[in-house]
Design a protein with these regions (language model features):
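Active-site segments that bind and position negatively charged phosphate/pyrophosphate groups
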Residues: 1-86
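C-terminal charged capping/lid subdomain of soluble metabolic enzymes
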Residues: 61, 68, 72-144
Length: 144
């Protein structure tokens, strides 16, 4: 509970802008499919989202790869960033979490509706890069 409180009280943002893009996407997954727990949906969507956006923030994803996922510093930042995402996805699989929407019995027939619901009345979903409907669908495609 303490970790949950810290993650939602702004403390971890250190005064920076906080985005919960993946949470917003996942809320539509578990909102449409009540059999999907929030954590399971996040385990599927975070790696897919990261694969979509990491090139815009290569240094940050590489730092995560080096410091958290123990990726070799002999790799370029871009290679390390991607490898870190792959290792995180493998870790989720190792601990028994789903890593694909298909593992949650969700297919592409739901992607457009989930994207529309994630956007609400907006044209884009704010985040480290703003995402439009087609980009959100692409993330769901990566996660399928």
């Amino acid at each position: 509970m303490l970790a949950s409180s810290f993650s939602h009280n702004g403390l971890t943002g250190l005064g920076g802008k906080l985005y919960f893009t993946v949470h917003r996407l996942e809320h539509e997954v578990s909102g449409m499919f009540d059999r999907v727990a929030h954590g399971a949906g996040l385990a599927v969507l975070f790696p897919a989202w990261a694969k979509y956006v990491y090139r815009h923030f290569t240094a940050r994803f590489a730092r995560f790869a080096y410091q958290v996922m123990d990726v070799s510093k002999s790799l370029t930042e871009e290679e390390a960033a991607y490898e870190g995402i792959i290792r995180l996805e493998a870790y989720f699989r190792q601990i028994g979490m789903p890593v694909r929407l298909s593992e949650l019995d969700i297919d592409e027939t739901s992607f457009e509706k989930m994207a529309e619901k994630a956007l609400g009345q907006n044209d884009t979903l704010n985040g480290i890069i703003p995402l439009n409907k087609n980009q959100i669908i692409e993330i769901f495609e990566i996660a399928k």
